[in-house]
Amino acid sequence: MKKTLLVITGTLLCVSCTTRPPLPLGETSKVSTDGRPIIPVTFVFTTNSPEATKFDNYQQMRKEIKILNKYYVDDKNNKIFKFKLHRYIPYEEFSKLHCDLKQQINQPYPITIETIPASVNTCFPKRTASKEVIVFIYDAYSTKWKFEDVTSRAFRNNGKPFILLDWNRLNYNIQAGSVHEMGHVFGLKHVCAPKATKRTPTNIMASAECKLGSGGLRNLGFTPVQLQTILSTYKQYP
C-alpha cells in the first residue's frame, strides 16, 4: 500500500483483469432530466500492477462515477454536474493500443509533463462525446517515493481534458483525488488552508502548496467564485 502523503497535484493548460469490452458509444444528452449538465467520463486502466488489478473492472468504474456525483458539489451541497460513465477501457484493451503513452507512464522514472498531452492525443485523437473527460488510472512514480508516490494530475489540453489518477486514490482515498483533479479540469487552482492538519475540513481545492498547512480533508464544496469558474470553463469545452 502506498504512503498516505499530502500530494500537490498539478494542472496544465499546460495549470482481477477484465476482458469486458468498452461500453458502446452513443450520443450523450448534454443535460440531465434534473437540468444538470452531463459530463461523459471515460476511464482507461493503464497499469497491470498486481495490487491495482482488482480495481480493473466495470463495477469499480461505476463506483467512481458515484463518487464524483456525490462529492462534486458547491458549498451548499448542491450537485453541479451529472457525471456519466461513457466508456471503460480495461488494461487488456489499453495494452493493445499502438501509441507511446505506455512508455510515458507506469515506468520506473518520473513522467515528462510536457510530452504527456501529445501522447494522449495520439492514443485518443478524437473525443467521442461533447465535454468528455478521460481519466487514466495509472501507477505514479517519483524519484523520492518510487512507486509509493500517489501524485495525480489534471490537464485541460486545449479543450480535450484528461486526468492521470493514481490507482491508490480510487474509492475516494487520499484527499478526494478524483474530485480534486476534476476541479482542476474545470479551471480551478489550488487554495491555501492555513494551519490545516490532515484531519481538518477544507475546500476541495485546498493544497499544502502554499506551505501554510496541510491540504486537509478536501471535503468542503466549491465557493460561489469557484462555481462561476467551473461553469465558465464548462462552456468553453467543445
Question: What does each model-identified segment do?
Answer:
Residues N48-D56, K76, T143-F147, L212-N219:
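Short, solvent-exposed loop/turn elements at domain surfaces
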Residues P161-P238:
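The catalytic-center signature of Zn2+-dependent metalloproteases
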Residues M1-T4:
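Positively charged n-region of N-terminal signal peptides that target proteins for export
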Residues R20-A129, K235-P238:
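Propeptide-to-catalytic entry region of secreted or membrane-anchored zinc metalloproteases
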Residues V44-N48, Y88, F136-Y141, D166-R169, ...:
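Active-site-proximal beta-strand/loop segments in catalytic clefts of secreted hydrolases
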Residues V15-S16:
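C-terminal motif of bacterial Sec signal peptides marking the signal peptidase cleavage site
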Residues A140-G159:
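Catalytic zinc-binding patch centered on the HExxH motif and its immediate surroundings
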Residues S32-R36, C123-K131, R153-N158, K195-R199:
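Extracellular/periplasmic catalytic domains that process cell-envelope and extracellular macromolecules
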